[in-house]
Regions:
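Acceptor/aglycone-binding surface of glycosyltransferases and processive sugar-polymer synthases
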Residues: 109-112, 116-124, 129, 141-225, ...
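Donor nucleotide-sugar binding loop of glycosyltransferases
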Residues: 64-67, 89, 114
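Hydrophobic targeting segments
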Residues: 53-59, 68, 75, 81-85
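Hydrophobic helical membrane-anchoring modules
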Residues: 1-54, 218-305
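Short, well-formed alpha-helical segments that are part of the catalytic scaffolds
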Residues: 37-46, 62-77
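A conserved acidic beta->alpha catalytic loop
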Residues: 86-95
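Acidic metal-phosphate-binding loop of nucleotide-sugar-dependent transferases
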Residues: 137-139
Length: 305
């Protein structure tokens, strides 16, 4: 398994126009707040670069009617499809999504939990690339082009990282930051990888690699481990166990626009810990890998079988 990191500075030509002003490594200025009495202008979709492979965007959602229209409006132009996986929303989530983006594919997840919704959407994707995106507005859809660029550069699976230079977050509490750091250390030690971020839902991969991620069980109606917020860790572990080429790109996590997060730090943190230990035991090969190399700005190999 190969793991690479891709930084924004490594690209000779920018692949998209940033929505934030860079202040330094890991920090960005948030978008200016709306002015009272003046309606916010609708974002202009940034088209994907010519030659980008077809992309399916999978968005799991439950009770996100207020957030989804803004997320869908920010998606880049030229996408192959957008798949909304609804988790039995009690609000106007589906209707709001269809108003904001006519032609959106809507699936109803058979089970419960974010992991179940993501697995269903991933298995239904028909584009060459699948991107997973949260429905709360915390991820910047303009970064999709950077994920696609890392895939076309040779990666099989790309994780967004809030901790690489150029990434950051306005939503991380000290507790979440410390917990993520401890879990990343454990993951890297057990899997001989060099992830910098683990509990972040912005990912992309070649759709042909979905079979290696072993999602059929998680997509079923019956409750199983992996169907909750631990899904991001399960995906990373399955990619590592399958010896996929994994890359990281810097990503900025914004504040949720409306409502409260369904994430519970302690409960879901324990589930992530369990996922790391459980999926390591399921590794069919468990072959030792060399120690990761030191970081560099360019794409690089940091571990080998």
């Amino acid at each position: 398994m190969y793991t690479r990191r891709v930084s924004a500075a490594a690209a000779a030509t920018p692949m998209f126009t940033p929505h934030h002003t860079l202040l330094g490594p890991g920090t960005r200025a948030p978008a200016p707040p709306p002015v009272a009495g003046i309606p916010a202008a609708a974002p202009v979709p940034i088209p994907l670069p010519p030659g980008t492979p077809s992309i399916s965007v999978v968005i799991p959602a439950r009770d996100e009617a207020r957030n989804l229209p803004g997320v869908l409006a920010e998606l880049p132009g030229g996408l192959h499809e957008v798949i909304l996986v609804d988790g039995a929303s009690a609000d106007d989530t589906i209707a709001a999504a269809r108003r904001a983006r006519p032609g959106i594919r809507v699936l109803s997840q058979p089970g419960r939990g974010k992991g179940n919704a993501l697995a269903c959407g991933i298995l239904a994707a028909t584009g060459e690339i699948t991107v997973t995106l949260d429905a709360d507005g915390s991820a910047d859809p303009a970064e999709i082009a950077e994920f696609a660029a890392a895939l076309t550069a040779g990666a099989d699976f790309v994780k967004g990282s809030r901790y690489l230079p150029g990434g950051g977050s306005s939503d991380l509490t000290m507790l979440r930051r410390a917990g993520n750091g401890a879990l990343v250390l454990l993951m890297n030690r057990l899997y001989r990888t060099e992830f910098s971020d683990l509990c972040y839902g912005y990912n992309a991969f070649w759709t042909r690699c979905a079979a290696a991620l072993d999602l059929e069980r998680i997509a079923a109606a019956d409750p199983v481990f992996g169907d909750g917020f631990e899904i991001e860790t399960v995906l990373a572990a399955h990619a590592a166990n399958a010896r996929l080429t994994v890359a990281e790109v810097p990503s900025y996590e914004r504040d949720r626009r409306y409502g409260e997060s369904h994430l519970n730090t302690w409960r879901d943190g324990r589930r992530v810990l369990r996922a790391i230990l459980r999926e390591r035991r399921r590794d069919p090969a468990r072959t030792p890998r060399t120690r990761p190399a030191r970081p560099s700005a360019a794409p690089r190999t940091v571990s080998k079988p």
